[in-house]
């Protein structure tokens, strides 16, 4: 059963199909937009975990390790945030050696906030 508009060219069925199509497209694009951030976050987390593995740092809980790695950048920009203070904090939190904590901190900074490496460690990067 179709109902025609005044000019007889458009039916109620066509209107409903157009509305359904628009709703479907809105859902697809909305879903894609909401997935973009988690996918990006997963890519960075995976890159971080891979870099830790390559550096010889073992971890048991990937999600906790990624969260700890992400916590480094706010420490860098906090007042008094020095490489030594951050490394000490990482060693304290994880119970890892100072050298291991230093490597963890460098990998975290290199992954999540690479722009602060040179200002944070000016004397360590000289050839």
From Swiss-Prot:
A lipid is attached at residue 35 (S-diacylglycerol cysteine). Residues 1-34 form the signal peptide. It is found in: Cell membrane. A lipid is attached at residue 35 (N-palmitoyl cysteine). Residues 121-127 are cytoplasmic. The keyword Transmembrane helix applies. The chain crosses the membrane at residues 100-120. Residues 35-99 are extracellular. Modified by Lgt on Cys-35 with an S-linked diacylglycerol, signal peptide is removed by LspA, modified by Lnt with amide-linked fatty acid. Pfam families: DUF732. It is a single-pass membrane protein. Keywords: Cell membrane, Lipoprotein, Membrane, Palmitate, Signal, Transmembrane, Transmembrane helix. GO terms for cellular component: plasma membrane. The keyword Chloroplast does not apply. InterPro entries: DUF732 (IPR007969). May interact with sensor protein KdpD. Overexpression induces expression of sensor protein kdpD gene at low K(+) concentrations (0 and 250 uM, tested in M.smegatis). This is Putative lipoprotein LprJ. The gene is lprJ.
